[in-house]
């Protein structure tokens, strides 16, 4: 299975600042020119919400302050500027290979 290692496990960011979350895969999640890495946001009591798919594509309805980058084994989610509603746990997920796997999550809090 592909192991996804997220960092940091938690971070506290001031309103309007940038939050950066990293995800490293144990092997490449690229195939045929695409990177099969996705990012989700989850708030307590709610299902995960897809933010970014294929490393850098913004899901419909998601604000442009969310952006994703990376390829191969190294990926990043950026949130800028951070807003109050962004306090949540964020997960990376690879969809290149079964079984689909998730990172352990990064909890974003506001200072």
Swiss-Prot record:
According to the record, the residues making up region (Complementarity-determining-2) are 54-60
Q: Does the keyword Disulfide bond apply?
A: yes
Q: Which Cys-Cys disulphide bridges does the record give?
A: 23-92
Region of interest: Framework-1:
1-23
Region of interest called Framework-3, as start-end residue ranges on this chain: 61-92
Which residue ranges does the record annotate as region Framework-4? 102-111
One GO cellular component term, please give it: immunoglobulin complex
Show the Gene3D superfamilies listed in the entry. Answer: Immunoglobulins (2.60.40.10)
Instruction: Note the superkingdom of the native organism.
Output: Eukaryota
Q: Where is this region: Complementarity-determining-1?
A: 24-38
Listed A to Z, the keywords are: Adaptive immunity, Disulfide bond, Immunity, Immunoglobulin
For the region Complementarity-determining-3, give the residue spans.
93-101
Where is region (Framework-2) located?
39-53
* GO biological process entries: adaptive immune response; immune response
CDD domains recorded for this chain? IgV_L_kappa
Q: Which PANTHER family match?
A: IMMUNOGLOBULIN LIGHT CHAIN
Protein name in UniProt: Ig kappa chain V-III region PC 7183
